[in-house]
Amino acid sequence: MTTTELVALLHLASPALPIGAYSYSQGLEAALDANLIRDADSARDWIASGLTDVLAHGELPFLAHQLARWQTDDTHALAAENAWFVASRESAELRRETEQMGWSLAQLCASLEWGDAARRATLASLSPIALPTAFAYAAAAHDASADATLAAYAFGWVENQTSAALKAVPLGQLAGQRIIVALRGAIDAAVRRALATPPDAVNTFAPQLGILSARHETQYSRLFRS
């Protein structure tokens, strides 16, 4: 990995990236309301399960394949699979989340003129655009490798989930850092699994997440948008 690639991926994984990730918990807040999360240990287990049972089977391999499609300018497959991913979201909240964050990242890519004009035109034509599709575009624009791209995406997801747990449980900063350290190995395993997943085996089936997310839409007290 070059220094340029590393810095670009650190930028994309940064919580300072202005795409609104901090405002979503992806069901974690609903899991807390359902008493599935009670403390640091149960928060760590919840986040680990989301990484290994959900992201590793769906979002991460989808991201890898979208990255390859951007790199080969396979615009037909890009559009078709982007639409499939948006349709696969289990609730209205989760769909709005990927659409809003995807749109925000796509606007950032266009404003910073990442990628050539032809690819930027393809990016602009994808509406709504899922976050992994936009993230794959940004990674392709910086010539990032698939394994590094997936690791950056997964780490950003773990960090955001941990941040949500710190606010909602609540947890202390040290407890949050322990969660992140504990999941480093799981991130590596999730990336390796995702890279070995063929396109027809990408699976976003997550019934518990879908149910909790739907419940969150009418939850009485909420900090987060999902």
UniProtKB/Swiss-Prot annotation:
InterPro entries in the cross-refs: UreF, UreF_sf
Coiled coil: none
Principal place of residence: cytoplasm
Domain of life of the native organism: Bacteria
Molecular functions (GO terms): nickel cation binding
Sorted UniProt keywords: Chaperone, Cytoplasm, Nickel insertion
GO CC list: cytoplasm
Record's subcellular location: Cytoplasm
Family: Belongs to the UreF family.
Subunit organization: UreD, UreF and UreG form a complex that acts as a GTP-hydrolysis-dependent molecular chaperone, activating the urease apoprotein by helping to assemble the nickel containing metallocenter of UreC. The UreE protein probably delivers the nickel.
Primary role: Required for maturation of urease via the functional incorporation of the urease nickel metallocenter.
Protein name as it appears in the record: Urease accessory protein UreF
Source species of the chain: Burkholderia cenocepacia (strain ATCC BAA-245 / DSM 16553 / LMG 16656 / NCTC 13227 / J2315 / CF5610)
Taxonomic lineage from the root: Bacteria, Pseudomonadati, Pseudomonadota, Betaproteobacteria, Burkholderiales
